[in-house]
Curated annotation (Swiss-Prot):
InterPro entries: DUF4333 (IPR025637). Pfam families: DUF4333 (PF14230). It comes from Mycobacterium tuberculosis (strain ATCC 25618 / H37Rv). This is Uncharacterized protein Rv2091c. It is a single-pass membrane protein. The chain crosses the membrane at residues 136-156. The lineage of its organism: Bacteria, Bacillati, Actinomycetota, Actinomycetes, Mycobacteriales.
Length: 244
């Protein structure tokens, strides 16, 4: 059975442009208006999407997208700051406690260990011993000088004035003459008559000493008398006592 010629609805749909061209067929154009829609869609899709997808090729977008690159590159500045903050190398300089921990300077017992150095260090104390010897010598010299002065003083006082060690002797002959004169002198003496044979101290020179005495024998008017003579000082001044 035959009908009007046209597309068979039982045949599968073919997109426009494939198979026979029915655009000039009024029946198809009127009875199947939906077939023009794909043509319109194809015609619409060509200009519509093409400029939209070509816009990313616009150089304005690449200029906008690279901007974040320097913007995001700023974290590198923040990343650099941690580098500055993380300069613990400066804090790491606290490893300088190695300077404190240089036990080699403290623990060099080699400088302290050699006992031979200690006697060398005690050597200066030996110099103090020399100083003590010098002080002893000085003290000894002072004592010697003082001793010399003392001895000199003793010698002066003993042999010169008042002459403790000097033994002054009175000439016994002069002493006898002096005793006879005192006995016979009528003004300053006893005014005795016939005074003779005066002998003193058994003929020995008496020692002059204050308070010392010596005895003299004398004959007065033929009578033997004894006279005591006393030294008044260390110079030889004497006093003749009354004849007895």
């Amino acid at each position: 059975m035959s009908g009007p010629q046209g597309s068979d609805p039982r045949q599968p749909w073919q997109p426009p442009g494939q198979g026979a061209d029915h655009s000039s067929d009024p029946t198809v154009a009127a009875g199947y208006p939906w077939q023009q829609q794909p043509t319109q869609e194809a015609t619409w899709q060509a200009p519509a999407y093409t400029p939209q997808y070509q816009q990313p090729a616009d150089p304005a977008y690449p200029q906008q997208y690279p901007q974040p690159t320097p913007g995001y590159a700023q974290p590198e500045q923040f990343g650099a700051q941690p580098t500055q903050l993380g300069v613990p190398g400066q804090y790491g300089q606290y490893q300088q406690p190695g300077q404190y921990g240089q036990p080699g300077q403290y623990g060099q017992p080699g400088q302290y260990a050699p006992p031979g150095q200690y006697p060398g260090q005690y050597g200066p104390y030996g110099q103090s011993g020399q100083g003590s010897k010098r002080s002893v010598a000085v003290i000894g010299g002072v004592i010697a000088v003082m001793a010399v002065l003392f001895i000199g003083a003793v010698l002066i006082l003993g042999f010169w004035a008042p002459g403790f060690f000097v033994t002054t002797k009175l000439d016994v002959i002069k002493a006898q003459a002096g005793v006879q004169q005192v006995l016979t002198d009528e003004t300053t003496g006893y005014g005795a008559k016939n005074v003779k044979d005066v002998k003193c101290n058994n003929g020995s020179d008496p020692t002059v000493k204050k308070g010392a005495t010596f005895e003299c024998t004398v004959s007065i008017d033929g009578t033997s008398k004894r006279v005591t003579v006393t030294f008044q000082d260390n110079k030889g001044t004497y006093e003749v006592g009354r004849p007895q």
